[in-house]
């Protein structure tokens, strides 16, 4: 199918979906391209970001955890956004696109529940029906967010097939959309999936990096040495990276979930430890068995528990413009505790992976003068029960 925008990033991306969905994807691409040129759409989107979501978000300097080192560490506070995470940014944009296309329903998938909450709040605000697919395991471990979604009128549908996690929720959401696309918009939650979703999500998240650049120049008078973000599908990271890609002196560091350790096979790090294949409508690195079946990913963080990654990240990795590392559950948990104890901020377990890598950089070279920015992509209220149970089992509380 001929597209208006390039569906690939290098060799990654594309539109590997059933023929029945091609008209829906084409309609979405046309609506997006039109909206990007429409001052009225942009004004409405920017008004919602400012007066409903609460942008711009703060850039907070860590006062205590860098003591005794030459590291200056800032946090981009997406946790302060309405809804509790960066997810709110792009769902407002997609919900406006849905209205522009005349859709009356929203279909979404969610892992940690943050995208589900964001989809529910945007649907409630704009008068759209909303149904959300969520792995049954994630429904159990993210019960506060499930209740929030239902409070805002969303129907939450537990998915019991497969590993009962995010990848299975994605499959069910796509299956639903195949039969309902004439009235429903599929509000994909990350910078992955078939074209044009990776491009749309990147554009509707790029204000994270744009704000960060302006704020750090105002605060420090220079650009950071590196910006750091966690990577599951990759939306918060591409939102942070997008405005810095051409700033070649700024390192881009994406942090994948190392789970119980890469050597155990129980992780979610396809960029560094997967193989390229076709999944979820795109060509990208993914966790596969020897015979090409999609492997189960694992992370303490439901929002990073995804066996593939967005095509922009695959491309940035292949060109060497961005570096991708992994952080284990234990390292993320220590970073979570550190930020709580020393800065009075409770981060999401997803964001704790990015923070853990920044702290590792700080500890390994304490004498090095470095200016780092971590994208604190969400708040940790949703994770307190998970952390409580782990710490209780360890006898730490």
UniProtKB/Swiss-Prot annotation:
Cofactor(s) needed: pyridoxal 5'-phosphate
PANTHER family: TRYPTOPHAN SYNTHASE, TRYPTOPHAN SYNTHASE-RELATED
Biological function: The beta subunit is responsible for the synthesis of L-tryptophan from indole and L-serine.
Classification via InterPro entries: Trp_synth_b_CS, Trp_synth_beta, Trp_synth_beta/beta-like, TrpB-like_PALP, TrpB-like_PALP_sf
Gene Ontology CC entries for this record: cytoplasm
The family this protein is said to belong to: Belongs to the TrpB family.
Residues that bear N6-(pyridoxal phosphate)lysine: 87
Reactions the enzyme catalyzes: (1S,2R)-1-C-(indol-3-yl)glycerol 3-phosphate + L-serine = D-glyceraldehyde 3-phosphate + L-tryptophan + H2O
Database matches in CDD domains: Trp-synth_B
Top-level taxonomic group: Bacteria
EC assignment: 4.2.1.20
Keywords of the record: Amino-acid biosynthesis, Aromatic amino acid biosynthesis, Lyase, Pyridoxal phosphate, Tryptophan biosynthesis
Family matches, as PROSITE patterns: TRP_SYNTHASE_BETA
Summary of subunit composition and partner proteins: Tetramer of two alpha and two beta chains.
Pathway entry: Amino-acid biosynthesis; L-tryptophan biosynthesis; L-tryptophan from chorismate: step 5/5
Listed GO MF terms: tryptophan synthase activity
Species this chain originates from: Shigella boydii serotype 18 (strain CDC 3083-94 / BS512)
Protein name stated in the entry: Tryptophan synthase beta chain
């Amino acid at each position: 199918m001929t597209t208006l925008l390039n569906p690939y990033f290098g060799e990654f991306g594309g539109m590997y979906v059933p023929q029945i969905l091609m008209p829906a994807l084409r309609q979405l691409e046309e609506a997006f391209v039109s909206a990007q040129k429409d001052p009225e759409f942009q004004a409405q989107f920017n008004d919602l970001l400012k007066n409903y979501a609460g942008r711009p978000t703060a850039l907070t300097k860590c006062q205590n955890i860098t003591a005794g080192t030459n590291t200056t560490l800032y946090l981009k506070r997406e946790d302060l956004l309405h809804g509790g995470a960066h997810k709110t940014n792009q769902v407002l944009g997609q919900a406006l696109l849905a209205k522009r296309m005349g859709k009356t329903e929203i279909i979404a998938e969610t892992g940690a529940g943050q995208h589900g909450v964001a989809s529910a709040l945007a649907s409630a605000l704009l008068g759209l029906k909303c149904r959300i697919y969520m792995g049954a395991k994630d429904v159990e471990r993210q019960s506060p967010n499930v209740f929030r979604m239902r409070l805002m009128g969303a129907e939450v549908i537990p998915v019991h097939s497969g590993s009962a996690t995010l990848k299975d929720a994605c499959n069910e959401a796509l299956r639903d959309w195949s039969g309902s696309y004439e009235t429903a918009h599929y509000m994909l939650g990350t910078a992955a999936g078939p074209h044009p979703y990776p491009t749309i999500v990147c554009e509707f998240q790029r204000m994270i990096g744009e704000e960060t650049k302006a704020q750090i120049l105002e605060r420090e008078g220079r650009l950071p040495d590196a910006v750091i973000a966690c990577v599951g599908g990759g939306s918060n990271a591409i939102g942070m990276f997008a405005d810095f890609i051409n700033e070649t002196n700024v390192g881009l560091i994406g942090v994948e979930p190392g789970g119980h350790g890469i050597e155990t096979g129980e992780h979610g790090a396809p960029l560094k430890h997967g193989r390229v294949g076709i999944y979820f409508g795109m060509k990208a690195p993914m966790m596969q068995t020897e015979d090409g079946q999609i492997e189960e990913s694992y992370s303490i963080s439901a929002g990073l528990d995804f066996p593939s990654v967005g095509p922009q990240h695959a491309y940035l990795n292949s060109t060497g413009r961005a570096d991708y590392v992994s952080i284990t559950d234990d390292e993320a948990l220590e970073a979570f505790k550190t930020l709580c104890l020393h800065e009075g901020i409770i981060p999401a377990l997803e964001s704790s992976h990015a923070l853990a890598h920044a702290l590792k950089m700080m500890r390994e070279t304490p004498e090095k003068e470095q200016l780092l920015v971590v994208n604190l992509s969400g708040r940790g209220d949703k994770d307190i029960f998970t952390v409580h149970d782990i710490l209780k089992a360890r006898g730490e509380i």
